[in-house]
Amino acid sequence: MFDFGLSEDDSELGEVDEDDGPSGFEDDLFDDEGGEKNLVESPAKNSAPFESIKGEPIDQEGVVHTRESGGGDSYLSQTRFDECSLSPLTLKGVKAAGYERMTAVQEATLPIILKGKDVLAKAKTGTGKTVAFLLPAIEVVSKLPPIDCDKKRPPISVVVVCPTRELADQAAAEANKLLKFHPSIGVQLVIGGTRMALEQKRMHTNPCQILVATPGRLKDHMENTPGFATRLMGVKVLILDEADRLLDMGFRTDIERIVAALPKQRQTLLFSATVPDEVRQVCHIAMKRDLEFVNTVEEGSEETHSQVKQMHVVAPLDKQFSILYGLLTDHISENVDYKVIVFCTTAKVTSLVAELLSELKLNVREIHSRKPQSYRTRISKEFKESKGLILVSSDVSARGVDYPNVTLVVQMGVPTDREQYIHRLGRTGRRGNEGSGILLLAPWEEYFLRSIKDLPITEATLPLIDLDTKRKVEKALAHVEVKDKELAYQAWLGYYNSNKFIGRDKYQLVSLANEFSRSLGLNNPPAVPKLVLRKMGLNNIPGLRSK
């Protein structure tokens, strides 16, 4: 049906979807020059001394570089867990979890963390960093005096802060696995989308030495749960996972409040895929001056995205649903154990695409922030354990969530930036496995390709859509609820209105939105509430209907 051979010229070429709403995003405390170049540079001949997180010279011994994952099991190092100074019970848990050799990230970070040092680790997702910070935390708790059962408010010893519910749930599950032979140590999970009263009861009646949380819900407990602030005064280790993502989602103020509520004499671990200025500023606030910076992403190392076969397709909006259907059916026919993630721009568009693909009789699940947490947990678990399934997702699945053996990632519409493209793509090609990625753009979204021109992405020829496919997709679209189309249109309008390239020209934006409306099979663009249009700065723009 579809021929995705390379075009002749290229044949030689190798809505914000958040969980817990942040309480605010403050202006940068220092300079606003982005990037990492002033933090730590890769060593070179005759290079100047490394610059520390505080901008002061440090010895080269203070920075650890390590290799990154390659093909097969090369993401594993030769170092075994039983060579590390872990207690016998923890080692039994590691072995029961099926771990024998450390990943490169674990090899680089574990010995330093076990010494009690504050550590900022630059580490990519899918490299074993969760185990790298959990094992030392478990060791700290295991060496503390036993909890007095009669104590009304026993201290919480470890706090792990994750940007999304899925990541928090994953970290808590990993902790429970590693704690198999530490029955007296308990892990509790506090995340948005669940009843606070239930969490309060669990923390009161069950052991809670390790608390895994999303920032918004943790702040809620600090403010509303009796005795919770007192329990936090016993914290020995604070872990900020996916720190750059936490800040991208606007949780800076919440993080500052959390840090202020904890004792100063503690160990702080911060893991981040990138280390921009915002992350460095959090280090100033949360970490000791003699912190260790461990860089596990060497200059020139093979990135996850370089292992993934990448293509982009440029097509008008009215052809994109048919192209998506063809891409998926072709992939399914070629891969008996297919496992696909389709990323969409907003939660409402995600819902619409999932409904359409379901009408087309594909095996589809959807996941986004508008779904209840219990549903999201169930779907995430099902997709993780299944084959022969398509997950239509907003960006709740873009980072950190480890879905094994994903064979294809499709991105519909322009990502917000280069980093988002890479993190979405990183759901496939993990741990040395192969994978494919396809970016589906409209002609007016081609500008984005300039930001990823250094990546090994090639242009696929525009596939021909046969009449049968076109009719099948149009029929399925006709069965999609009109209300869902209206909500998707409004969300689409909001997403592209906030895009600095497309949203600048409001008249052109409305024209494109109405093109999207027609691609949904609507004769007239849906009416949008006047208040919403006013907030978008789109009132009185010709072509829009208000209500």
Swiss-Prot record:
Membership in a protein family: Belongs to the DEAD box helicase family.
Residue spans of biased composition, Acidic residues class: 1-34
Xref: PANTHER family: RNA HELICASE (PTHR24031)
Taxonomic lineage: Eukaryota, Viridiplantae, Streptophyta, Embryophyta, Tracheophyta
Domain named Helicase C-terminal: residues: 327-478
Broad enzyme group: hydrolase
Protein name stated in the entry: DEAD-box ATP-dependent RNA helicase 31
Record remark on domains: The Q motif is unique to and characteristic of the DEAD box family of RNA helicases and controls ATP binding and hydrolysis.
Segments of this protein annotated with the region Disordered: 1-74
Residues that coordinate or bind ATP: A123, K124, T125, G126, T127, G128, K129, T130
Bias (Basic and acidic residues): 53-70
Disulfide bonds, paired cysteine numbers: none
Keyword list, A-Z: ATP-binding, Helicase, Hydrolase, Nucleotide-binding, RNA-binding
